Structure formats: C-alpha cells, structure tokens
Amino acid sequence: MKNANKTGIIAVTGATGYVGGRLVPQLLEAGYNVRCIVRNSEALDDRSWRSKVEVYKADLSLKDQVIEALNGVEKAYYLVHSMAASSNFEDLESSMAEIFSKAADINKIKQIVYLGGLGEDEKNHSPHLTSRHKVGKILSNGSTPVTELRAAIIIGSGSASFEMLRSLVEVLPIMVVPKWVTQTRCQPVAISDILFYLVSVLDNDKTLGKIIDVGGPDILTYREMMHTYAQVAGLKKRIIIPVPVLTPRLSSHWVNLTSPLPIRLARSLIDSLTSDVVVSNNPISAVLNHDAENLHNSIGRALTRVQNLQIPTRWSNSVKSQIAELPELSDPEWSGGRVLIDSREQKSLVTGKKVMSTIKTIGGDTGWFAFDWLWAVRGFIDKLAGGVGLRRGRRHPSELRVGDPVDFFTVVK
C-alpha cells in the first residue's frame, strides 16, 4: 500500500543495472512512486515490479531527453557509472553527470542521491574511482542538493566483486598474487546494507549536501577476504603466494581467464583494490543507526541465494546497461551500431510454447544442443580477446529476460 505522505515521484536511473534493479522494489515496498529512466525499456518488461512503476525511455547523454524525463520528479537516484565501458568513459561520465545536474536544476528537484566509490579525494586512485569522484563533484555543482554515498566492494549474489572473489577461490587452490593482495585494506559491504542506506537517506535532511562513507564492520586485506570465502564455502584454506612483479594489467588478464568477468571490468575492479578503500571522513553510522552485516554472513547469504537461484540482478546487466555506445535492437541504421540478426525457420510437431521452453535453457550448464566443442572453441577465442567466454553462464537455468547473459551472448528481445 502506498504511504499517503510519499506522493512525489522518485526517479531511478540505472534501473536495469545491478544496484538499481534491486533498489526499485525496495522503494516500492517503502511506499514511493517510482519512475525508471532507462535507455532500453524492454529490459524491464519481465521484472516482477514492472506494472508498479512508470518507465520513461531516455538517453542520459541527450540533454533534452533528460530534462523531459525528470519533469515532475521530486527526487532522483543517479546510479550510472561505466565500469566496463570504452576508453573515453571519463568524458562520457562527466558529460552525462553535467546534463543530469542541469536537468535537475531546471526541474527544481529536491535531492539527488548518488552512489559513488569509496576513497579519499586527495589520494592517487584508479581512473574509474577518480572519475566517480569527479561525477559526484559535477552533480554537486548545481543547485540541487546531492547526497553522495561512497562504497567499496559490494558483496551480494550476482555482484561483480562477489563473482570475482568466488571464481578465484573456487577455481584456484594455489594462487600467485600481486603483493597488494596481502597489504592494502578494503571495507566490503553487503548489498542489503547498501539498499537500506540508499532508501534511508532519501528523506533525511541530515544527508543533504553530504559525502558519506559506507562500509561493513570488517576491514580486511583481499587475502583475508579470500580466506573468509573459503571458510564460508567449506573449502580448504587457499595457498596465496604474493610476488612483487604482477602488475594490475597482468592480474586483470589472470582474473579474466579464471572468472566470468570481461577484461575491462576485471581491470577496473583490480585497480580499485590497489590502494586502501576504507571508511574515514564521514561514516554512515554518524547519520543512521544500523548494524551492517559482516563479511562472513554476507558471503553466506550470497551463496545461499545463488544456490536457490535467487539472483534478481547480475553484474552483466550493469555492464550492458551502462555502455551507451553499444547498439540496441531498436537503434536506427544511421546510428552507427548494428545488431546482427540470424533468423531460421524449422517445422516442429510440438507446440511453440514447448519449443520455446526448451530454447530458453540453451547455454550455461545445458550447453548448446549441438557441436558443443565448437561453442567451447568460440568461448576460448572470446576469452583470448578479453571477453567473457563461457564462464559467464546464465542468471537462471530456465528463465530468460531482456538483458540476461547466455554465455557470451546477451538477450536483446
């Protein structure tokens, strides 16, 4: 039931992504009226909450579209960043943030909530973390009050950080790692806590115009995180050998080969771990009274949800939704991108529904019905090129929706 005091519209950008796709149902449960601003509206068609929200199709890089999308909005979430985008991601992120800030001012929005990356401004960080800090500053340059939450590693079923941790520990009983794995500290936080904070700061005047650090109760090295995962998963303690010669670039290739993550995303995650990312200046505990989940419990919860096929969103949804230059099926031919379509027809003695239910299981553990070894070669070639290969698998063994991964393919319609 709607809360009578929550009549304003709350806009959510990045609703097809990992965090945004989980935030929307939380906002609905809290009684808010939600407008999802997305580039591809079909990506939300199969969400259980689709009929409860307003969907507005807009490209965040186009000012006129963003101004229209924010018309009538009271407050807005900015959950867009380009962890796996192209080399010009910094310019793209800055441009979109500036457009969004100006559009918010024009529409007299009361608050922007932005999820950024944890880390002190004056330190030398990775290009992606530096860009996320810059986006926060650009959003704050306008007249609309901004609440910026900064988080480091997010642990949850389907998150990129969790999948990297999971793959490394489960695949490799012995690891040769760069020395920062045993030295730099991070403060992981559960996705459930992130969602709680995102909802809680919305109507909290104490958070307006503030940069707030968010983290769980544990401060650990990445080696300690891997040992914790092994313990929770019931695996033997991994042998981790630090060496001084593995650069982030070499490490990202190694992660790409052993995990479902594409090399650009792996590099972004690794770069973010090469310096300390812990809560320091303005902790969320000073604003909200909430007992965050420790790493042991958050890993256990994530593993349980994976085993029970409870993965409402996955990192692969975020990668696709955040790369604006990737083509969509609905894009006109003059736009430059193109989705190739190979259409085949074959008569069948069974119903279309039965055929489709079988087709929907393709890929992942099921395989490709014919010439599996050729698909394996295709996946290996994709890995060599820095892609996801076959390890990305599927979100669910028998369900498909727009945006879902099927090994190295993505469902577009």
Q: Where in the sequence are the language-model features?
A:
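SDR active-site strand-loop-helix element
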Residues: T13, I37, L79, I112-G117, ...
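Mid/C-terminal beta-alpha module of Rossmann-like enzyme folds, strongest
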Residues: K2-A4, I9, S200-L265, D276-R344
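Conserved glycine-rich Rossmann-like NAD(P)H-binding loop of the short-chain dehydrogenase/reductase
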Residues: Y32-R39
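Glycine-rich portal/gate segments that line the openings of hydrophobic small-molecule binding cavities
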Residues: V339-L340, K347-K413
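NAD(P)H-binding glycine-rich loop region in Rossmannoid oxidoreductase-like domains
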Residues: E42, D46-N107, G117-N124
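N-terminal Rossmann NAD(P)H-binding glycine-rich loop of SDR-like oxidoreductase domains
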Residues: K2-Y32
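Conserved beta-loop-beta element that borders a ligand/cofactor-binding pocket
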Residues: G116, K137-G158, M164-E170, K179
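Substrate-positioning beta->alpha
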Residues: M96, A160-S161, V181-L202, K210, ...
